[in-house]
């Protein structure tokens, strides 16, 4: 993004509009996203991306292109669902397009407004991109191995999970909430969220194994 004078100029206009709390914030975000999508990625960066894919993901046919911003998972600001990630990406061209879409999601009108309300400056926000192999899964979600409200509390592992692999990270539905106690050595479903029924015994066993692995990795 720093290589494009037009993008830098648009970022400057957006910063000024945010300082003035101007009405033009939304159209400025839309224009900035358009510029990011249409601007060609520099050759050196394309070369680095290609080398990294060959070195780490050779032979992979289907990819996930995920957002990874420093302006998420913060105290008082989770940013769940406001940045874009893309599944079922199957070509080099689509990978590059998805990377630009992830970058553009940092300056969507919604994400900019929510960060402004949380007191997070645009100057302090950056977006990384994680490219992974897409694998078949029975369910997906987010696991936290420390109490989010108390980092010194390691007694429980918290898992938000959904039978639809992408629901939790997209923030599109309320997930099941599962709690595993490392003190008691057992787990339970705290909330079903939008699900109509709980996971079966094998599903619970998988979550317990996952919680133990997460704690060991920690």
Protein language model features and the residues they cover:
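Beta-strand scaffold of nucleotide-dependent catalytic cores
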Residues: 66, 77, 86-88, 98-99, ...
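N-terminal beta-alpha lobe that positions the nucleotide/phosphoryl donor
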Residues: 1-130, 139, 205, 218
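Conserved catalytic alpha/beta cores of large enzymes that bind or transform nucleotide phosphates
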Residues: 157-218
């Amino acid at each position: 993004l720093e290589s494009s004078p037009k993008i830098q100029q648009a970022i400057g206009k957006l910063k000024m509009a945010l300082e003035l709390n101007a009405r033009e914030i939304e159209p400025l975000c839309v224009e900035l996203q358009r510029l990011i999508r249409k601007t060609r990625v520099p050759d050196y960066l394309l070369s680095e991306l290609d080398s990294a894919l060959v070195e780490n993901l050779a032979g992979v046919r289907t990819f996930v292109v995920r957002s990874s911003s420093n302006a998420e998972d913060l105290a008082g600001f989770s940013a769940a669902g406001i940045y874009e990630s893309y599944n079922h990406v199957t070509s080099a061209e689509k990978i590059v397009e998805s990377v630009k879409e992830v970058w553009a999601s940092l300056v969507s009108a919604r994400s900019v407004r929510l960060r402004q309300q949380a007191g997070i400056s645009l100057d302090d926000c950056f977006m990384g991109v994680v490219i992974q192999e897409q694998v078949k899964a029975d369910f997906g979600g987010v696991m936290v191995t420390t109490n989010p409200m108390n980092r010194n509390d390691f007694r429980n592992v918290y898992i938000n999970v959904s039978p639809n692999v992408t629901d939790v990270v997209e923030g599109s539905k309320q997930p099941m909430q599962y709690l595993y106690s490392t003190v008691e050595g057992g787990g339970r479903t705290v909330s079903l969220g939008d699900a109509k029924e709980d996971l079966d015994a094998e599903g619970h066993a998988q979550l317990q194994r996952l919680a133990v692995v997460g704690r060991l990795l920690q």
